[in-house]
């Protein structure tokens, strides 16, 4: 139990050290990449929808997998 706690604390400490001393050479590029991952495109009415493809109208009939107008 003590060994497990020591290992967890050591890993957390080393991770924190990496985060604080790591260089960010392409800060603007990373920010743009993060923003593009956060931007979601929606599927128009009549298009395919699922758990990962979202409708612009926010109405998906999952039994047929199609976006519908509300």
UniProtKB/Swiss-Prot annotation:
Cite the record's tissue specificity text: Expressed by the venom duct.
Q: Which InterPro entries would you find in this protein's record?
A: Conotoxin
Which domain of life does the protein's organism represent? Eukaryota
Q: Where in the cell is it found?
A: Secreted
Please verify whether the record's keywords include Signal.
yes
State any single GO MF term: toxin activity
Q: Which keywords does the record carry?
A: Disulfide bond, Knottin, Neurotoxin, Pyrrolidone carboxylic acid, Secreted, Signal, Toxin
- Signal sequence coordinates: 1-22
**The record's note on its domains:** The presence of a 'disulfide through disulfide knot' structurally defines this protein as a knottin.
The name under which this protein is listed is Conotoxin ArMKLT2-0111
* Record organism: Conus arenatus (Sand-dusted cone)
């Amino acid at each position: 139990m003590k060994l497990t706690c020591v290992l967890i604390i050591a890993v957390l400490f080393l991770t924190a050290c990496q985060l604080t001393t790591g260089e960010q050479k392409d800060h603007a590029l990373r920010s743009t990449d993060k923003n593009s991952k956060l931007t979601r495109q929606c599927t128009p009415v009549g298009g395919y929808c699922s758990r990962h493809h979202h409708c612009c109208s926010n109405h998906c009939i999952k039994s047929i997998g199609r976006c519908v107008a509300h």
